[in-house]
Amino acid sequence: SDRMRDMLNTLLGFFRLDNGKEQPRLSPCRISAITHTLETEFMPIAMNKGLSLTVKNVCDAVVLTDKERIIQIGNNLLSNAMKFTDNGSISLITNYDNGTLKLIVEDTGTGMTDEEQQRVFGAFERLSNAAAKDGFGLGLSIVQRIVAMLGGTIRLDSEKGKGSRFTVEILMPIVDEQTAQSRQ
C-alpha cells in the first residue's frame, strides 16, 4: 500500500541521512516556489480540519539551495503542526536576509513541556500526545539532520497548551536572476 511504501521510504531516508550518505543537490530556486508548493499541499488539509493556515514570504529572492530538502523540512514541520493542532491556526513564514533563509512554522497546538522539548528531536521519539497518531517518531529527527547537512540551525520555542514555533535558519547564497533563468 502507499502508506507502507511511505513508511519504508521514511525509514530509508532517515538511515541514509544518519549515516552521512546524503549530499545537498544545489540549484537556483525562487523562495516563493517553495512556499507556493507547501501552501498548495497544506491548505486543503488545514481547511478540512477547520484550521487557519497563513503563508507569508517576506523576501522573494532566488537562492542556491537544495529545493527538495527545503520543501521536505517545511513539509515535516507543517505536517506535525497539522497533526497536533485541533483548532486555531498555523503559519509558515519565510524570509531571506543577510545571506540566510529563515523558515518559521508556528502553531496553536498542544505545545510541549521543557522535558518534551529536550526529547523531541530524538530518533524514534514519540511524545505522549503522539500515541494515537501515525508515524515512527522520525519527522523532527529527519528535519534536524537535513538542516545540519545544509549547514543550518533549528530552534524550538514551545509551551504546553500554547503551541510551538520552529525556526530554521540556513545560510545560502543569492543567485543573479539572469544566471538562474539561463540555467532553466
Enumerate the language-model features and the residues they cover:
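Conserved glycine-rich
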Residues: G151-G152
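Conserved catalytic submotifs in the C-terminal HATPase_c
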Residues: R25-R30, M47, S52-A61
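Short alpha-helical Gxxx[C/S/T] motif in the catalytic ATP-binding
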Residues: G139, V143
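Short helix-loop "hinge" at the ATP-lid/N-box region of the Bergerat-fold HATPase_c
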Residues: A81-M82
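Helix-loop junction within the histidine kinase core
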Residues: F15-L26
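Short alpha-helical segment within the cytosolic histidine kinase core of two-component systems
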Residues: H36-N48
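Short conserved segment of the HATPase_c
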Residues: M112-F124
